[in-house]
Amino acid sequence: MHSTIKVNAEREGPLTLLKESSHNAPYKVIHYGSRHLHEHLELIMMSASPGIMDGDEIDIEVNVHENAQLKLFTQSFNRLHPMEKGAVQRTNVLVKKGGIYKFIPHPITPFANSIFRTVNEIQLDETANLIWGDIIASGRVHSGESFQFSRLHSITKVYSGKKLVLYDNQLLEPGRQPFDSILFYERYTHQATLMYVSPYAAELKAELDEILTTQYEEFTFGFTQCAPNAVMIRAMGNEGVMLYDWLSAMGQLCWEFTVHKQEEEQAKLDAEQTTEPKAEEKTAPVAEKQTKQKTAKRAKKEATAKSTAKKAKAIPVQPVGEELEEELAEAVAEK
Amino acid sequence: MQPLLTLLQINDSMFPIGSFTHSYGLESYVSQGIVHDTPSAKVYANNMLRHSIYYNDAAFLQKAWALLEEKKSVREFQKLDELITALKAPAEIRDASKKLAIRFLKLTQELHPIKRCSNYLAKIQEGKLHGHYAVAFAMYAHGSGITLKDALLAFYYNTLNGIVTNCAKLVPIGQGDAQKILFDLQATIKQLVDEQESMDEEMVGLCCIGQEIRCMQHEKQYSRLYIS
């Protein structure tokens, strides 16, 4: 069965709205809770089918337009049923200038003999922000079905300003790899990855260096600056729900951080525009009051945030507002 | 220039490019007690060759070689360089590849300059390319009249030599046991080299999840001897 899901998130004033979205059976994309609850957009992807069946083809397209903010949720674990031919999912994401897109789906659970190929192509503007997660279980672990699937290939390519910045190539083929061995899952049954691609990534990494100082008993994790503008967290554990909750909390932290940073920059821009530029200020000369000028300036500002972020890495304590510090602490405590 | 002698020299573990300062995650495995004796060191070495090196550095070497054979444009090398950079997620592993590439290129240029290598080094130093050791090695070996098969055999051998030497120092395992692992995996290396060229495009850069996590954890390891 061939299904398509299309989502367009557009910014109108302070709000992000859902425009020109479409989906067909068994999928449905609806507002997650009341649409009036947030200024950003929250959607949930639902399915009337018990999972992905043999021969299924799913095409997902998500467009996050300029400065739009979208969180896309899933309803439940993505179950891959026993197959002969296999199923394919293709996802294309586009995040434009200043946009934020967060997608951390529930774990993929591959049943015995399932064959699945998922390809994610993500195009980001250099000022766009991506919070992207994926969790793969070894199977229906509690039913004693672990690594009984045939093949699971997950390819994720992230481009920032047309340049390939991240390429995650995960092939899980129980006949090919020794999963219970060194280099692979060791004694674990689940793997999780979170990518944060953003002009603020280096600054977030410095925050994580302060926050994620000890390992947990239930799972093992590592994090790294995987590109100048990207941070990656990877984990292995035995509980899908626990990894999902933790990854969601970390994703929420990335979201709050991004929004806070953007607001900070916007406030600075607004202040610059209302006050006369002083001679000693090193900022570029303020041009005529044109509305278009604002967006151009913002883009420039965001581009330079990259170099600022690089420098910031050397500073041990980040100048972050108390409010955000509290939010970060809460997000971690929620775990 | 003698191809075999050149290969022996540039591939020597004592070739001073700093490869002995990297453990590529092994130090984490040892400190966490996962690699703790000769049998587990052998499993680690075997898995590294078959599941990490084969799909990554050796595959990058082979891809660079193919571009050299086909006399591809600079743009194609830039794409390969970007691909490798995007695949090497753990920062220490990415940096290791760059540092080794720079030192390898600088040193080999003093021995016998090869134009492509000097161009690659210049691009890395200008910040236009990231720089990766496997590509640098392929360029110099190709320019020195070495065959792809020999270059690959030597590359696997030296990678494995680095692994067993690190195991001997870190785990530790006996020098004799280390040499036994090196010898016993000859057939594996031969098989991987024979299959290298037929690798499907989508298999290049396959990730070993546990290995990546351990490499990331190394950044936070309290006491450490190695850079990666």
Placement of each model-derived feature along the sequence:
Chain A
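Conserved beta-strand/loop scaffold segments within soluble protein domains that form the structured core
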Residues: 1-206
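A structural signal for the main folded, soluble domain(s) of proteins
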Residues: 138, 151, 319, 326-335
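Charged low-complexity "KEKE/polyampholyte" interaction tracts
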Residues: 164-170, 174-278, 282, 324-335
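Intrinsically disordered, polybasic Lys/Arg-rich low-complexity tracts
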Residues: 274-319
